[in-house]
């Protein structure tokens, strides 16, 4: 039986980005294993020697993104930070971004342009509390992968540094 993979989303004007689903609904779909879309011609051999390949490629990043957003969906307070009712498009964006960052397919940039992580996160209030909650959910997802220690450390170091770099608000409101 094929492993679940998220349905693709699109950022192009006029194209649907997902279907409405209840908060907490399963993020999996019925696409064939490793496919981001029915026309995806992903060839794992193209990425030999990259961290993307070492960690397990598309399957691993799909599991990471799915597990992260399934954890987020259960946290109603933190879930409110995400404007989309359906978290699958957000999970797909995370998966594609991480695949590209770690040496895999460039699908993220092909669909969405340059990652511009700080710009894309600017509309959201990210203080140290929100960073810590995000890291808590990402820790659950990373632990679910059961990676070799060196791979886990490399991946976690990136998430920790990225989360710290995205802080754009103080924890206390400015005094009036």
How would you name each of these model-derived features?
Residues 2-176:
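Core of compact, soluble alpha-helical bundle domains
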